[in-house]
Amino acid sequence: MQNHATSMKRVGKIHFVHHLEKLYAAPNLGDWIASPYYYFTDFFSRYTCVLHSDWSVLWHEIERDDIVIFGGGGLLDNSDALNVVLNRLIDKCDNVIVWGAGTHKYTDNNIFNKKTAITPINYEKLALCGVRDYQHPTGLPFLPCASSLNPAFLTKQADVPIKRKIGTIKSALESTFAVSGLPSSVTNAEPIQVIVDYILSSEVILVSSYHGAFWSLLLGKKVILPATRLGVDKYKYFRYPVAFYDKDKYDEQELLALAATIPSPPDFLSESRMLNLEFFNKVRNLIEERIEKSVENSTVQILSKRVAQMEFTLVEMWNYVKKMNGRIEGVEGKKPQ
């Protein structure tokens, strides 16, 4: 990592760059709540913070001595365009931090029809770095996604009864799931508490989304992914073993037999939270060394906090509206007996 010489502190900004879905795109809750901004607001609110989407960085806001926190979500090697964005951030700012972002390498015939990025990332110029991929060939330090700090994960298994042998979490970005005949499912666009309760009420989780698998491991569940997911290597570097199902039709007995071949994850939630708290301490030390707390720019900070809160709640509001519409249509469609 880059070695920073001691310099005079200035009133700078902290920039948070993570993935926010574009207008009319299906929401991916995991990317929305993966930024560490949401979990350390007591500290970050002392400074002027600016939130950016990875596809729409406000470049004019970023200055040389500011702080940039990149992540989480699968932002590394996901595309050449994203690698260019990160390298440009590194060139523009001396204090760029990668926090819990994930790497990607695609096979030739992957279901996403994507190519592996060939633009190298200048990791050696980062101030701090931690990636969500465990024992990745790059040798980058392991740091689970910051979404593990979400308070929803404090829900106890004892408070949620088991309702099903196998639950399924589908990616809202996909029109079809790789396995047909599912008896039960939710998508990764649901509110986080809904997803947590669904995971806890299932014995085993079949899932196509990275964060759905990660959250299930946090909650101590055995995880199975469709084998089609092996087209991108981000599914190969979970902290604890997962299994891959190579059939295209749901077979509960086969899935349960497959689940029996993998160990139950230990207390991954505590481990993940501890690693994020340790990394936060490093980030806090860097910030306190480099920039002063904000006084004059408090209005900008308040506005950016409100934007962050809206990011957190809009997807939940939209999903509740859809549910209510479904219930209304169901009631209107019933004929009098």
Question: What residues fall within each predicted segment?
Answer:
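Active-site anion-handling motifs in enzyme catalytic cores
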Residues: M1-Q337
